[in-house]
Amino acid sequence: EEEKRIDWETLYHHLKTDFQDKGGELVRQMLSRSARYGGGNTISDQWAVKISESYSNQVRSVSQKYPGYQFIPGWFSWSNTIVLGKQVGATPNGRHAFEPINHGANPHPGFRKDGALTAMSNSICAVQPGYGNTAPVQLELDPGMGRGEEAVQKIADYIMTLFEQGATLLNINIVNGQQILEADKDPSKYPNLVVRVTGFTAYFCSLTPEFRKLVVDRILIQG
C-alpha cells in the first residue's frame, strides 16, 4: 500500500474471490514476487518475528489461566499441510484458496527462484518460539551437492551454523529430482524410496497421490 500498487480493500477483495475476478491473476503474480518471508531481511521477515513473538506470548499466557497445564507454542504443520490448507482461503503470498499450506516454518515453495538457502534459514531461525518447542527447517538437497570432501564440509558447516543461530529441528531430504519424478509417475518402480515428509519419514509409494505431489513440488522447487 505504501508503494501505491494496491490498497487493503482491493487486496481483501481479491483474496475473497481467490484471484478469480478481473485483474486477479495479475495481482496474484505481483504478490508471489513481492518481498516475502524467507527472503532475507525483508519487511515480511520483520513482521514474521513480531507475529511469532506475539503468538508465543499469547500461548504461554493461557498456561497462567489453567494451573497444572503447560501450553507450548510451535510453528509446524507436521503432516497436516493438505488438511489445514483445505480450511484456509487465498493468502497474500499468492497462494490459491484451499491449496496446501507451507511445511512448518518454511516459506511456501517457490518463494525465491534462486533458492536462497541462507536467507531462508536465517528467517526460520529468527521465528523460533522457544519454551522447548520448535520451528523446523525443511531442507531439500540433491545428492550431487555432497560429491567431494569440500562439498560435504560445506553442508556440515551449514548445519552447524544453522543450530548456532538458534534452529531447533532440521529435516533433510537427499533425493535426485529426476528419480522423484519417475517415482511419482510409477511408485511401484521405487518401492524402497524413503523420503522425509516433515517430522517423519515414509516410503514414497505409501503416500497418497495428493501428498506425493506436495513432496515432489517441494523437492523440485527447493532442491
What are these regions (language model features)?
Residues 1-223:
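Acidic, glycine-enriched catalytic cores built around paired aspartates
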